Amino acid sequence: MSALRVSVDRIHPEGRCAMTEPQRRFGGGGERDARHLTALEEQLGAARTRLAQVSAQNDRLATTLREARDQIVALKAEVDRLGQPPAQFATFLEATGEGTADIVSAGRRMRVAVSPAIDLATLRPGQDVMVNEAMNVVAAFDYERTGELASVKEVLPDGRVLVLARADEERVVRLAGPLLDGPLRVGDSLTVDTRSGFAFERIPKAEVEELVLEEVPDIDYEDIGGLGPQIEAIRDAVELPFLHADLFREHGLRPPKGILLYGPPGCGKTLIAKAVANSLAKKAAELRGESQAKSYFLNIKGPELLNKYVGETERHIRLIFARAREKASGGTPVVVFFDEMESLFRTRGSGVSSDVETTIVPQLLSELDGVERLENVIVIGASNREDMIDPAILRPGRLDVKIKIERPDAESAGQIFAKYLTPDLPLHAEDVAVNGGTKQATVDAMIRATVERMYTETEENEFLEVTYAGGDKEVLYYKDFNSGAMIQNIVDRAKKMAIKDLLTLGQKGVRVDHLMSACVDEFKENEDLPNTTNPDDWARISGKKGERIVFIRTLMQGKKGTEAGRSIDTVANTGQYL
């Protein structure tokens, strides 16, 4: 390498070999010197190539060393990170001062420092935070999203609630940030972390939320037709004790705790219950001098209240009455309405596949006349099989008042028709002209004609022939199965026919012919309904009580002459409907 460097140094920078002193003196080296110069130039080129290769190799080596150094640094950082103690999560309680806060970690309450990078004003109770090995808060996160379910028993001041956890264990917990923004009520389901003592989230459950509908009904007594005596009886039972409580106390009378509305389906039991709540709200507002009426109508869907787990249905009933007492504590009337009451509170010991009623019935009895009195709470039950309800519920002191909702007679049917067939409806011009040109007279004539068509005991109105256990037979007419719901349906059918005539024929308005056709269609549609394995049970549901029915024959199909009337015999009683 040194010999190469010496040879390179002896070459002129311009690429020519410098001549030695003897060469200049004797006139040059000639051809031999030229060859020597060429050889030196070749050596120089080879040296430059080798130098470039060595330089490139040196660059690659330097790059490899840098990469190795970076990997070593990264590995060292990873080793240091793995060697650090674990960071802990805690629950924020409250800010205590400049840069400090109280937290709960693993059940321990501590006062720790907070990193300057975190704004204490943005932290809310119950929020998750991260602490380092020195137990300083270094990061903030969202709220806990899991926990045990607990039910609110009582709302306490200062952001606390009393909840019922598993096995009815009572516990006082704090409310986390999201729950502080909205009101809570008894019975709400919350997610609770028992370690930190916080409730984080309200969980909508399909328990009482779906079974209970809190509302102020918009149904008035004037909206109900054909039930004047029943409405008067229920107003005497409900409104008098509420409006004249001092007179009742003076005479030593207690208001009734409950009312049973019984009768065939579709005759207005639910409407009456809603009208009671509405009327009570108005009367209560008048007593207080308030302009806006307020009441609560808790509509209990009986069959959906049943639960396959032991004790759940009873707990729901307790929760319903607890909510009713809560709403009524301020003097606001509360109506608890049990629809289809026989599905929940049937006679104990009558169950076919279970004896769930043996515990549900006593639970209701304890709520009605237990230690806690029901103030401003009215229990109304509705049923079309009152014979299946446990007698202990129906005795005086519980459901004191029993009101039968009968099927409408001709006069009542006219009143019900007047609720749905009004002069403000579009009426056909010919019908109006026939009745003196006034809409009210036209409506009255339509109602009279329709009621006469429905209630006349003619052959075309014959519906069923029933045979009793004693051998007697009786012909039942369509009027014997009429109801307010059927009347509304007839009017709706007539209105649809009027709309179709307007679209197809261009003739606008309801006609009496539409009502007549609607009656025929409604009767025809109902001829297949008495189809049950037990005619006597079907007759009881439909409101026909008395001697046991063993045979039913429909008469409408047989009158047309195309096919015989359909017969229904009594078969072995399975206890269930098809």
Swiss-Prot record:
GO CC terms: proteasome complex
Any one biological process term the GO annotation gives: modification-dependent protein catabolic process
Keyword Cell division: no
GO MF entry, a single one: ATP binding
Keywords noted in UniProt: ATP-binding, Chaperone, Coiled coil, Nucleotide-binding, Proteasome
InterPro entries, per the entry: AAA+_ATPase, AAA_ATPase_domain, ATPase_AAA_core, ATPase_AAA_CS, NA-bd_OB-fold, P-loop_NTPase, Prot_ATP_ID_OB_2nd, Prot_ATP_ID_OB_N
Keyword tRNA processing in record: no
Pathway annotation: Protein degradation; proteasomal Pup-dependent pathway
Record region (Docks into pockets in the proteasome alpha-ring): 577-578
SUPFAM superfamilies registered for this protein in UniProt: P-loop containing nucleoside triphosphate hydrolases
Chain coiled-coil ranges: 35-84
Residues involved in ATP binding: G266, C267, G268, K269, T270, L271
NCBIfam families in the cross-refs: pup_AAA (TIGR03689)
Listed PANTHER family: AAA-FAMILY ATPASE, PROTEASOME-ASSOCIATED ATPASE
Function: ATPase which is responsible for recognizing, binding, unfolding and translocation of pupylated proteins into the bacterial 20S proteasome core particle. May be essential for opening the gate of the 20S proteasome via an interaction with its C-terminus, thereby allowing substrate entry and access to the site of proteolysis. Thus, the C-termini of the proteasomal ATPase may function like a 'key in a lock' to induce gate opening and therefore regulate proteolysis.
Family: Belongs to the AAA ATPase family.
Domain notes: Consists of three main regions, an N-terminal coiled-coil domain that binds to protein Pup and functions as a docking station, an interdomain involved in ARC hexamerization, and a C-terminal ATPase domain of the AAA type.
Subunit structure: Homohexamer. Assembles into a hexameric ring structure that caps the 20S proteasome core. Strongly interacts with the prokaryotic ubiquitin-like protein Pup through a hydrophobic interface; the interacting region of ARC lies in its N-terminal coiled-coil domain. There is one Pup binding site per ARC hexamer ring. Upon ATP-binding, the C-terminus of ARC interacts with the alpha-rings of the proteasome core, possibly by binding to the intersubunit pockets.
Protein name: Proteasome-associated ATPase
